[in-house]
């Protein structure tokens, strides 16, 4: 017998035609690249806490997690960028701690009718003001307008001309709900009515972060390529870093799940630099935003996670720079990080964003990895695209080997077996690796085939005759990050002489 049949017996005598299926050469499946968002749900919501829940729409998130909840808002922002991709969520248990509060104090009687425009995050809340309105009346109208929008992250109460805004959840993330008056200003036809004075005290006082240990357990061994979390405190990220590690975590050989964590932090340059210096993990990207950014940090996380998901699913090696964070309001002009400040952030493990024509965009999604085990500067894992490319390459190889050689015998090179036999040799596997590399080269994932082939090693293990050891040395295609040009001008070229 030459051809290897998985099930048809070699001694079959019953006539006549017998066929079996073999799909080993047909697999062309690509990973769906599912995403995961971690966030808080309202205490009276119906969603199960610390359980994986698939989330196809923002409407469903509002229904099960509660409108205005952190999780519902994150899903809404995510779906604004990625309406198609597979999305899962985990609703975490609210932490022990305090609830963030902010105030809007109104003074002076209105001397003209108009509209008060208060921005809570990226959402504008408007209250009508009539000539002669006292602060108490204006405050009551503003509080009513806030409470009329169930999708806001805060509730409002008015007393003696002061509107107190209270976050819907306890915890640190409530401090990062920005408040602003007339974001677009006079140019955008936003003006405070004459006679009305408004003083805003930013959201503050929120304390506590949820324990993510149960959350991580709920993730199980389900693959998630893009994991968004608004909890950027050290303890929360340490828990996720442990889950992502290269030894026993999602990037370890025994699990092979891969994925990347996206989080964000709002702060001054010095605060963000100090924050970046506390981390050194290639599987986490922490984006830094200016104190004046007019979008809640949890929504920024969801937007950035979604934008990466959309881009990386299409091409893991293509840079995510310029990706629009749809619906986010950037810090006003004059309050944004300068080029020098952005450079400092990128030198300290903080991913950056920039604003162009009022649109907030990804500038560079670096990881927090900065130094090797000896504390020496190391740029091998600088960009998150490198990690996504690595996952893509490994999955491609795994798909080929597990599809084409699931039940093969192993022999030495030069063994004279008949055609059709389910036997593989190191040389055959090396050819398979080279063919796969060529395919990925045409797809723009890798480069330098000749050098790759020169350094590729495929050999039988000297101690275990059933094992093949492979040294796979891919050269990843890089991203165009910097275009440097020296404009060496002339006033006029001299004519050449014969």
Where are these regions (language model features)?
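Bacterial flagellar/type III secretion structural subunits and associated motility module proteins
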Residues: 108-112, 116-120, 184-211, 219, ...
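Surface-exposed ligand/attachment interfaces on beta-rich extracellular proteins
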Residues: 133, 158, 206-214, 418-425
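Extracytoplasmic/secreted envelope proteins and their assembly/folding machinery
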Residues: 136-143, 213-216, 237, 241, ...
């Amino acid at each position: 017998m030459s051809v290897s049949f998985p099930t048809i017996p070699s001694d079959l005598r019953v006539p006549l035609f017998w066929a079996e299926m073999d799909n080993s050469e047909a697999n062309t499946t690509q990973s769906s690249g599912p995403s995961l968002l971690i966030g808080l749900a309202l205490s009276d919501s119906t969603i199960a806490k610390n359980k994986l829940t698939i989330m196809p729409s923002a409407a469903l998130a509002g229904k099960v997690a509660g409108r205005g909840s952190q999780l519902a808002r994150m899903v809404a922002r995510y779906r604004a960028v990625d309406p198609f991709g597979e999305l899962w969520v985990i609703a975490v248990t609210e932490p022990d701690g305090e609830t963030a509060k902010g105030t809007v104090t109104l003074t002076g009687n209105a001397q003209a009718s108009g509209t008060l425009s208060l921005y809570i995050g990226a959402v504008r809340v408007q209250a009508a003001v009539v000539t002669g309105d006292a602060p108490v009346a204006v405050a009551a109208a503003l509080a009513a307008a806030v409470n009329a929008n169930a999708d806001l992250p805060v509730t409002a109460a008015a007393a003696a001309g002061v509107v107190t805004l209270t976050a819907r959840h306890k915890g640190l993330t409530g401090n990062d709900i920005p408040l602003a008056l007339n974001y677009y200003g006079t140019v955008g036809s936003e003006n405070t009515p004459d006679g009305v004075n408004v003083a805003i005290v930013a959201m503050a006082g929120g304390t506590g972060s949820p324990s993510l240990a149960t959350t991580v357990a709920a993730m199980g061994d389900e693959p998630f390529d893009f994991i968004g979390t608004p909890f950027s405190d050290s303890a929360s990220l340490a828990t996720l870093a442990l889950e992502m590690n290269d030894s026993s975590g999602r990037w370890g050989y025994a699990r092979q799940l891969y994925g990347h964590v996206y989080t964000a932090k709002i702060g001054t340059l010095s605060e963000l630099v100090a924050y970046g210096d506390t981390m050194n993990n290639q599987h986490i990207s922490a984006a830094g935003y200016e104190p004046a950014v007019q979008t809640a940090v949890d929504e920024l996380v969801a937007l950035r996670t979604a934008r990466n998901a959309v881009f990386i699913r299409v091409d893991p090696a293509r840079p995510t720079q310029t990706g629009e964070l749809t619906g986010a309001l950037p810090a006003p002009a004059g309050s944004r990080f300068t080029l020098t400040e952005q450079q400092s952030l990128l030198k300290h493990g903080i991913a950056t964003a920039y604003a162009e024509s009022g649109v907030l965009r990804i500038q560079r999604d670096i990881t927090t990895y900065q130094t090797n085990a000896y504390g020496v500067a190391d740029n091998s894992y600088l960009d998150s695209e490198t990690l996504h490319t690595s996952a893509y390459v490994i999955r491609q190889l795994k798909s080929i080997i597990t599809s084409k050689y699931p039940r093969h015998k192993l022999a030495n090179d030069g063994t004279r077996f008949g055609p059709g036999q389910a036997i593989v040799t190191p040389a055959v596997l090396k050819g398979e690796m080279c063919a796969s590399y060529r395919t990925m080269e045409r797809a723009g994932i890798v480069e330098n085939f000749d050098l790759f082939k020169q350094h590729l090693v495929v050999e039988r293990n000297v101690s275990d005759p059933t094992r093949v050891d492979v040294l796979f040395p891919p050269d990843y295609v890089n991203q165009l990050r910097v275009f440097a040009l020296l404009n060496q001008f002339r006033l006029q070229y001299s004519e050449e002489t014969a």
